[in-house]
C-alpha cells in the first residue's frame, strides 16, 4: 500500500509540474490564461465496512482548472491590436469553418480585407449600414474591409453657423455743418460696420468652392445685411434681424428646413471644366446672436466632402469599427462581436490562443462590447498573459520537493 501512495504522489506531482511549466512557458503569450492543478485524495473502499476503517491510498489530480482573471493591458499603438477589458471572448471562424473563441486581439487585415488572427481565423462581428449606423444582420459574420471601396464625394447642402455680431456697431449718416451763430462743424458719417468669415463648400464632384459671407450693419436697429462672395464681387442674399435681447428673429429658413436661415446659390465656376450647374446651400443661422461683444465665430461647418480613399480603421470601446478616409471622414463599417459562457472553465483549449465550447461550458451568449456584462475594448493595446511568474516559480519549487518526497 505504501508503494501505491508514493506512486500516486509522483504522478500527481509530475502532472502539477506539467501545468506549472506550461504556465511559465506562456508567461508572455498574449491573452493566455493560467491553469491550476487541483488534487483529491483516493480512498480504498470496503464493501460493508465501517466508515472509520477506510484507508487512504494516495492522491489524484481531480481537475486542471483554467483561471480566467483579467490580464494587464499593454499599449502597442497598433490600431488593430485590441484588448478586452472585462469579460467576454472574441468570436472566430476557423479555416475549417468551425467556431472558436479567444482573448488574444492581435489582429491583421489580409489582402482581401478580412480581419484575421495570426492563425488565420476570421474575426466575427456585425455589419453596419454606414448611412444609419445600425446593424444589418442579427447573427455575427466575418468582418471584411475591402480597401478598394472609396467614399464618394457629397455635395454641400447645409452650412451651420454660430457667431456673434457686435450690438455696439451702428451706421450713422453724419451731420452737416451749420453756419450759426454759433457755427457747428460737420460730423462725418461713420463707416458701416462689416464683418466677414469664409468656408469651403463642395460641389457634386467633391471640388472645394470657397465662399465668403459678409455681414454689414444697416441704419435700422438690430438689422444686418448679408452678402456672399464666390470671387471678388459681393452679392446680397438677405437680411438678418434680432430682437432687443440679441436673439435672432429672421429670416425664417425656407421649407422644408426649420428655424432661421438663408439660401446661397453657389456656382462652381470658375474653373468648372465639367460645366456643373449652380447649387443651393442653406446657411443655418439658429445660433447667431447680437450681443454687446466683439464679432466672434464659434462654429462654421458644412456637410459636404470630397471623395476619399480608405487609409485605416479604428476600433472603439463599443466594438464599433470606424473606417478612416483620406478626406478626413470616418464611417462605421462594422461592430466586433463578443461571446461569454456560463462556465468559462468548461471551455477546452485547442492551441493558438483559442478555446472551443464544450457541454460543460454551455452555449455562447453573444453580444457586443460594453453591452450588459460584456467588457469594453481598447484599441492599440493587448491583454497580457495572467501568469504570475513569481508565484509560478515558487509553486514549481514546492512541486519539485513534493515529487522528491514521494520518490
Model-assigned labels for residue ranges:
Residues 22, 33-388, 393-395:
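Small/polar low-complexity and glycine-rich loop motifs
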Residues 3-6, 392, 399:
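Amphipathic alpha-helical coiled-coil segments and their boundaries
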Residues 406:
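Acidic/polar, glycine-anchored loop/turn motif associated with catalytic or activation segments
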Residues 10-13, 17, 389, 396, ...:
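Amphipathic alpha-helical coiled-coil segments
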Amino acid at each position: 500500500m505504501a508503494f501505491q501512495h508514493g506512486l500516486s504522489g509522483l504522478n500527481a506531482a509530475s502532472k502539477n509540474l506539467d501545468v506549472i511549466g506550461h504556465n511559465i512557458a506562456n508567461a508572455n503569450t498574449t491573452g493566455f490564461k493560467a491553469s491550476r492543478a487541483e488534487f483529491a485524495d483516493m480512498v480504498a473502499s470496503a464493501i460493508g465496512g465501517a466508515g472509520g476503517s477506510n484507508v487512504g491510498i494516495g492522491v489524484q489530480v481531480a481537475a486542471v482548472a483554467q483561471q480566467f482573471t483579467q490580464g494587464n493591458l499593454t499599449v502597442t499603438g497598433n490600431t488593430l491590436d485590441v484588448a478586452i477589458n472585462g469579460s467576454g471572448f472574441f468570436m472566430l471562424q476557423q479555416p475549417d469553418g468551425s467556431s472558436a473563441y479567444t482573448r488574444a486581439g492581435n489582429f491583421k487585415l489580409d489582402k482581401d480585407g478580412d480581419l484575421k488572427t495570426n492563425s488565420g481565423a476570421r474575426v466575427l462581428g456585425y455589419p453596419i449600414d454606414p448611412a444609419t449606423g445600425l446593424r444589418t444582420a442579427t447573427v455575427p459574420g466575418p468582418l471584411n474591409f475591402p480597401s478598394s471601396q472609396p467614399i464618394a464625394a457629397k455635395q454641400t447642402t447645409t452650412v451651420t453657423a454660430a457667431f456673434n455680431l457686435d450690438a455696439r456697431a451702428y451706421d450713422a449718416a453724419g451731420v452737416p455743418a451749420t453756419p450759426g451763430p454759433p457755427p457747428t462743424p460737420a460730423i462725418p458719417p461713420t463707416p458701416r460696420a462689416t464683418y466677414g468669415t469664409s468656408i469651403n463648400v463642395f460641389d457634386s464632384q467633391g471640388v472645394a468652392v470657397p465662399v465668403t459671407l459678409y455681414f454689414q450693419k444697416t441704419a435700422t436697429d438690430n438689422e444686418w445685411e448679408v452678402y456672399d462672395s464666390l470671387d471678388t464681387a459681393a452679392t446680397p442674399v438677405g437680411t438678418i434681424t434680432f430682437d432687443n435681447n440679441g436673439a435672432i428673429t429672421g429670416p425664417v429658413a425656407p421649407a422644408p428646413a426649420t428655424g432661421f436661415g438663408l439660401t446661397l446659390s453657389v456656382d462652381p465656376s470658375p474653373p468648372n471644366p465639367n460645366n456643373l450647374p449652380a447649387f443651393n446651400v442653406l446657411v443655418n443661422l439658429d445660433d447667431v446672436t447680437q450681443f454687446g461683444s466683439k464679432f466672434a465665430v464659434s462654429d462654421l461647418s458644412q456637410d459636404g466632402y470630397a471623395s476619399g480613399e480608405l487609409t485605416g480603421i479604428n476600433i472603439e470601446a463599443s466594438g464599433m469599427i470606424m473606417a478612416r478616409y483620406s478626406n478626413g471622414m470616418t464611417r462605421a463599417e462594422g461592430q466586433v462581436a463578443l461571446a461569454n459562457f456560463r462556465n468559462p472553465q468548461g471551455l477546452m483549449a485547442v492551441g493558438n490562443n483559442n478555446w472551443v465550447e464544450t457541454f460543460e461550458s454551455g452555449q455562447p451568449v453573444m453580444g457586443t462590447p460594453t453591452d450588459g456584462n460584456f467588457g469594453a475594448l481598447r484599441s492599440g493595446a493587448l491583454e497580457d498573459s495572467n501568469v504570475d511568474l513569481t508565484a509560478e516559480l515558487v509553486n514549481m519549487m514546492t512541486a519539485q520537493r513534493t515529487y522528491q518526497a514521494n520518490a
